[in-house]
């Protein structure tokens, strides 16, 4: 059986942990002037990938 290829863009976006995959928050790159300080602060850090999306991430990144 042939080796599976990893989707490189996905490999850079997700990190495997013991409890699933973690990812960065969206909506934090640009157009920040109209967003409140509270909202920007809450977008800080990482969150876990939702359960319904874990299978997709596993298919895209079979070796991480």
UniProtKB/Swiss-Prot annotation:
Pfam families: Ribosomal_L35p. The keyword Transmembrane helix does not apply. GO terms for cellular component: cytosolic large ribosomal subunit. Keywords: Ribonucleoprotein, Ribosomal protein. It comes from the Bacteria. Transmembrane segments: none annotated. InterPro entries: Ribosomal_bL35, Ribosomal_bL35-like, Ribosomal_bL35_CS, Ribosomal_bL35_sf. GO terms for molecular function: structural constituent of ribosome. Coiled coil: none annotated. GO terms for biological process: translation. PROSITE patterns: RIBOSOMAL_L35. Belongs to the bacterial ribosomal protein bL35 family. This is Large ribosomal subunit protein bL35. It comes from Acinetobacter baumannii (strain AB0057).
